[in-house]
């Protein structure tokens, strides 16, 4: 079996933000994140993820607009819950929008969206995007209250923040965080939402997450960009997809369908 060309087992979303970070470091036109996205598709990526931040530190508006009509898979646009970003998303019309928390001083997204604390605002954002024909995902911590709030807000998809798992410093902490994610996946299924995951995943920690049968999609970027420095971009994409699919196929957890959960 060619693992990187195995659709439907588990999807890989390639985040191209850090290709844009390299480009912007010198203010050049290269490396081109659009070219990276198209090559990633050829190498087996099931979707392309990119984060249009309010400060435009990596991805620019022009990148999103230029890339949207060229993709053969799906565009998953990450953005903050602000009216400016929601309006941009509705204008561009990606297949998916993942709403994320955002602080200007952070290096990368540091935690999940607080849907419980900002319920009315998130619910309104979900409605605006859904009315524009865009599927909405909420990037949240693996927490039962946040999952319930996400479902109540009208989000058909959640993306579980795997940062604490990725940053675990010993086996006990790692196992505890993995159990937390597994429990959150079950909770998401119970609420009838599609469950994705991502943040901090790389070539040696992705396997246990990819093996969880209830997870539909993993979004990974920095690790692939970093690995590509040594392995080459398309090889890096292929290797990550192969690792994920192999982990899922070798999992002892039955990959049973869950009625009522959107795909």
From Swiss-Prot:
Active-site residues, as the UniProt record annotates them: 51 (proton acceptor), 78 (proton acceptor), 199 (proton donor)
Keywords of the record: Cytoplasm, Pyridoxine biosynthesis, Transferase
Annotated binding of 1-deoxy-D-xylulose 5-phosphate, by residue: 17-18, 53, 58, 108
EC number, as in UniProt: 2.6.99.2
Annotated positions binding 3-amino-2-oxopropyl phosphate: 15, 26, 200, 221-222
EC main group: transferase
Cleavable signal peptide: none
Cysteine disulfide links: none
Cross-referenced NCBIfam families: pdxJ, PRK05265.1-1, PRK05265.1-3, PRK05265.1-5
HAMAP family in the record: PdxJ
Protein function: Catalyzes the complicated ring closure reaction between the two acyclic compounds 1-deoxy-D-xylulose-5-phosphate (DXP) and 3-amino-2-oxopropyl phosphate (1-amino-acetone-3-phosphate or AAP) to form pyridoxine 5'-phosphate (PNP) and inorganic phosphate.
Name the UniProt record assigns to this protein: Pyridoxine 5'-phosphate synthase
Organism (species): Ralstonia pickettii (strain 12J)
């Amino acid at each position: 079996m060619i693992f990187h060309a195995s659709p439907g087992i588990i999807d890989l979303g390639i985040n191209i933000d850090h290709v844009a970070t390299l480009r912007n470091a010198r203010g050049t036109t290269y490396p081109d994140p659009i070219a990276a996205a198209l090559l990633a598709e050829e190498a087996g990526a099931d979707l392309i993820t990119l984060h249009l931040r309010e400060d435009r530190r990596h991805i620019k508006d022009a990148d999103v607009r230029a890339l949207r009509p060229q993709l053969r898979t799906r565009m998953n646009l990450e953005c903050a819950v602000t009216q400016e970003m929601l309006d941009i998303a509705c204008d561009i019309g990606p297949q998916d929008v993942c709403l994320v928390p955002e602080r200007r001083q952070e290096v990368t997204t540091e935690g999940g969206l607080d849907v419980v604390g900002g319920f009315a605002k998130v619910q309104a954002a979900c409605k605006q995007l859904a009315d524009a024909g865009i599927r909405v995902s909420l990037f949240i911590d693996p927490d039962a209250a946040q999952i319930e709030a996400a479902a109540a807000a009208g989000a058909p998809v959640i993306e579980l923040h795997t940062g604490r798992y990725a940053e675990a410093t010993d086996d006990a902490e790692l196992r505890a965080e993995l159990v937390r994610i597994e429990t959150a996946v079950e909770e998401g299924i119970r609420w009838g939402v599609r469950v994705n995951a991502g943040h901090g995943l790389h070539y040696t920690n992705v396997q246990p997450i990819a093996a969880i049968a209830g997870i539909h999609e993993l979004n990974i970027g920095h690790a692939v960009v970093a690995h590509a420095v040594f392995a080459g971009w398309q090889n890096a994409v292929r290797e990550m997809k192969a690792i994920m699919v192999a982990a899922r196929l070798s999992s002892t957890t039955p990959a049973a369908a869950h009625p009522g959960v959107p795909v």
